[in-house]
Design a protein with these regions (language model features):
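Short acidic/polar active-site loop segments enriched in Thr and Asp
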Residues: 3, 57-60, 133
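Alpha-helical recognition/docking segments in bacterial nutrient-uptake
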Residues: 1-50, 123, 129-130, 247
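Hinge/beta->alpha junction and helix N-cap segments in small-molecule ligand-binding domains
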Residues: 37-47, 63-119, 136-144, 166-168, ...
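Glycine/Thr-rich phosphate-binding loops of Rossmann-like dinucleotide-binding domains
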Residues: 14-16, 33, 70-71, 145, ...
Length: 247
């Protein structure tokens, strides 16, 4: 018998949940009595919209897939839409269920669905605000698929359409980011989850939601900031100039 468990979003662990076992969840909400550790998804959604707008996008589109279980990832949409509404930025949202898009790579029907819905928006068939010129994808994997679909339509990224993903993933062979993205530190999430679990096992109180910092990561699918806006603000990661040390 184990003394504690850390469960990730997709874990099927309901049968192990009881008052005698210390349990910490990553991203998924089970109940207010079970601590949930995650990057700050609400702020991440706002940050994605803000970065697109600051780089010149004037009409935004959110594309995401959601799971049937309650999880913190849903807050990305709330943050994105909240920023747009507060700043009167035209936007539209596309949400696919996990049944519609079980995998953005291996499912031909899912890929076809993403492409057809995206094309309808880019052809102004599903939005009254005109063609979007800034897209926030709920994950980096989804952003890669969207970039490929846009290029098949003859649209350039980022010249015609800017694109921001979420997670901050990098290609294994080059170490370069998939796309411009909202980066969350998975190492910090893991360490914080272990710390929360140890505190629970020692009888200490732990917050029900632990939101960790996130930052914008330039990956080449967004335009540079305007000269008048080249300054560091919360959530903006600027390129490191030659000879500059950020440590």
């Amino acid at each position: 018998k184990v003394d504690g468990i850390i469960g990730v979003t997709f874990s099927d662990v309901e049968e192990y949940l009881d008052d005698t076992l210390a349990f910490v969840s990553i991203e998924r909400r089970f109940s207010k009595d079970i601590p949930c550790v995650s990057g700050d998804n609400y702020l991440g959604g706002r940050m994605a919209a803000e970065n697109l707008v600051r780089r010149g996008a004037t009409n935004l589109l959110l594309v995401q897939t959601i799971m049937s279980v309650d999880n913190e990832v849903r807050k990305r949409r709330l943050g994105f839409e909240g920023y747009c509404e507060e700043n009167e930025i035209p936007y539209a949202s596309i949400t696919f269920s996990e049944k519609q898009v079980p995998s953005v790579y291996s499912s031909f029907s899912a890929r076809s669905l993403i492409g057809s819905v995206l094309q309808a928006h880019m052809n102004n068939q599903m939005t009254e605000n005109g063609r979007p010129n800034g897209i926030f994808a709920g994950t980096d994997h989804l952003a890669v698929v969207i970039q490929e679909e846009l290029e098949q339509m003859g649209l350039r990224v980022p010249e015609d359409v800017q694109l921001v993903g979420y997670d901050g993933l990098r290609w294994m062979n080059t170490g370069q980011p998939f796309v411009s993205s909202i980066y969350q530190d998975t190492g910090m999430i893991a360490k914080t989850s272990v710390d929360c679990l140890m505190r629970l096992m020692n009888g200490e109180a732990v917050e029900d939601i632990v939101d960790l910092p996130i930052v914008f990561q330039d990956g080449g699918t967004t335009l540079p900031l305007p000269e008048t806006d080249i300054k560091e603000k919360q959530g903006i990661m600027l390129p490191i100039r030659e000879g500059e040390d950020r440590r």
